[in-house]
Structure formats: structure tokens, C-alpha cells
Amino acid sequence: MKFLVINGPNLNLLGLREPAIYGSRDFAVLQDFIRAAAHEAGVEVELFQSNHEGAIVDAIQAAYGTADGIVINPAAYTHTSVAILDALKAVALPAVEVHLSDVSTREPFRQISYAGMACVKTYMGLGFEGYRQAILYLRQYLEEANA
């Protein structure tokens, strides 16, 4: 089983960007955490990060036929990108949305998630642990769907 894990804009600045919200661990630590969580779950992961909406859309499209599912933290594009929503719907791979912070308790403009409309589940406010939960959930979801 293989998952594409997508991280959107500014996540490459973890540790620098608003540590009171996102924590002090940097992006390399997050990548290591995701790899370890995938290994523990017995799944393969491909990691992708971009600050560019079109590159994220391209990565989602490229996952068709090469990945079994997607874990996505679209970051700021969560609240603005119909293009990412449409790409997720087009490839029709099961996807799980992750947010480090609890976006439901933040600014009003963060209350809508376009990407979440195409996802089977969302984890928010769990920090890095949200990625582990997403990987485990997606594995279980696929196992049950293929049973």
C-alpha cells in the first residue's frame, strides 16, 4: 500500500513560522515523523511539499495509478483552492485531510475547507500526531474497502 503525503504552502517553514501555533519542530522533523509512522503502519509513503497551488494539483493528478490514497495538509489552500478540491475529486483516491492546528477555532476565514469536501476524514489540532492518525485511518479504510 502506498500513500502520497502532500504538505502545502509555508509548511516548509515549520519551527520558524508562528511556533505558538505550529510548534518549534522543523519540517525535516515532520518528514521523519511521517516516514516513521508509515513504516510502523506498514505502508510506503511519497512525501511532497510545495508553496504553489498548480504543483499540488499536478502531484494529486500524478498520484492516479501510482498511489492508493492521499494524506493532505493543504495549509492556506484549504480555504481557497477549488482547484485542489477538483483534483482530489477527479482522481477519486481516498484522501484524509490533516491540519497541525485546530483551524475550526481560528480566524473566520479558516472555517471552510474546500479540500475537506473531497476527503473521507479530517484530523486537526493534533500536531504531528494527526499525520500518524491519518495514515492509520487511511490504511484501515482501504483494507475495509478491499475486504
Locate each region found by the language model.
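Short acidic active-site motifs
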Residues: A55-A59
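Short beta->alpha junction loops
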Residues: E46-G54
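Extreme N-terminal starter segment of soluble prokaryotic enzymes
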Residues: M1-L4
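Short acidic/histidine-rich motifs immediately flanking catalytic phosphotransfer sites
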Residues: A63-I70
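Short, glycine-/small-residue-rich phosphate/pyrophosphate-handling segment
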Residues: V96, T105-A147
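Glycine- and acidic-residue-enriched helix-capping/strand-helix junction motifs
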Residues: L14-A28
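Helix-loop-strand module that forms the ligand-binding subsite of alpha/beta enzymes
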Residues: I72-R110
